[in-house]
Amino acid sequence: MNAVGISLGMKCDAAIWAVENSIRDTKVNGYQTCPFDEMISNLPGIIECLRDDFKYFCDPEHLSLLFTGKEHFVYNKKYRFAFNHESPGHDDLFKTQEWPEGLTHYINNNYAHFIERYQKRIQSFRNYLSNPKNFIIFILKRYNTYQTDLYELKKVLRLHYPNLNFHIIILSNNNNNEVKNTLRMLQFKEDEEEFDRLNYWCG
């Protein structure tokens, strides 16, 4: 079988780790970018998104521009995802990547270019998972997570892809402050389960 590494977040460092450890090909070598490779996600949101089969991922009704106090992020309110690689001004990507419409390229015309980009990435994800010749190695970076915590994720993957052969690699993230800041940025409140779980395990 053909092994394909695909990131499930929480940030793009999961995808970087997969490339550095020869679990995932680079774009130059033919890898087609998938939706969770270059964004900021959370496991409950990913499970809900997969359960919905990405129905609201690119829906402008659920997209907004979120100001975190330092910069603006394209934000999906339903799944609580942030898209830093398409956000105005983030790391001056609009300059280094030469976005055709400048700073606001991905939010212009009701997120038209954002939608186009992510529809392609969603289709790449579906293509990889639907190919019976592929063995999918998912890479998930998440704090204090074990295989026993992934029951719902595995369940929803099998629901939509019943013949899928896969394995999930968990990368630990024990930087408590970094995780808390990320959860706050994604609009999680400190009395929600993600914070409760973090506080219980990390103190």
What is each PLM-predicted segment?
Residues M1-G203:
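Extracellular glycan-modifying ectodomains
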